[in-house]
A protein has these predicted regions:
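Hydrophobic alpha-helical connector segments
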Residues: 64-98, 102-108, 131-134
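Short, hydrophobic secondary-structure boundary micro-motifs
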Residues: 25, 94-96, 150-151
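Hydrophobic alpha-helical bundle segments that form small-molecule/ligand-binding pockets
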Residues: 107-155, 188-191
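C-terminal peripheral helix-coil segments that are non-catalytic and often amphipathic
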Residues: 119, 147-192
Length: 192
């Protein structure tokens, strides 16, 4: 097999999905590709570069619409698409936390979100901060969603008893996500 950046990313994703980010090392990646670790550096600079490539691959799952007139609809769309893409890869939220948003597709997505935030009424001065807020909401929600999916019915019942039975642990993650997004967007509408 020819070693290309695409082959490296595919092997890295295989390791991530099988063993998690803790086991994604240059050594395990080289072993997965049947090469020596030093050979990886002919294609990628370092682990940071690898994280950037993986994050770029994940964001390629997001197809931006040609045009969305309603900025709230555009922001909801991009948040939902980002969540969907993140849920496909194990430890994706950690990859994004460790990567830098400088790749082509990530830049397009960021520009799309910044434009929608500006049209939504957020001042240009605050658009990047609002974009970070939206990004962090999606990343933290997905991390929590993945963790909560492994909650057994017994654990959920125990949590409800600790909190008070009137507070139900809602396992409809899309409903939870949309509620939180609605709260976030309403706040942005109030404080521009």
């Amino acid at each position: 097999m020819a070693i290309t950046k695409e082959a490296i990313v595919k092997a890295a994703l295989d390791i991530l999905n099988r063993e998690g980010i803790a086991n994604l090392t240059m050594r395990t990646l080289a072993k997965e590709l049947n090469i020596k670790a030093a050979s990886l550096y002919l294609h990628i600079k370092n682990k940071q570069d690898l994280y950037n490539l993986i994050a770029e691959h994940i964001t390629q799952e997001i197809s931006l619409p040609e045009k969305v007139d309603d900025p709230k609809e555009a922001l909801t769309f991009i948040a939902m698409e980002f969540r969907r893409a993140l849920l496909k890869t194990r430890d994706s939220t950690e990859i994004f936390a460790r990567s830098v948003p400088i790749t082509l597709n990530r830049t397009k997505i960021i520009k799309f979100a910044l434009n929608a935030l500006s049209r939504y009424g957020v001042s240009d001065k605050n658009c990047v901060t609002a974009g970070n807020l939206l990004n962090n909401y999606v990343l933290s929600f997905v991390a929590d969603e993945i963790r909560t999916r492994h909650t057994s019915p017994e654990e959920a019942k125990q949590l409800e008893q600790l909190w008070g039975e009137q507070y139900v642990l809602n396992m409809d993650f899309e409903e939870q996500f949309l509620y939180g997004l609605k709260v976030l967007l309403a706040g942005l509408q109030q404080i521009k």
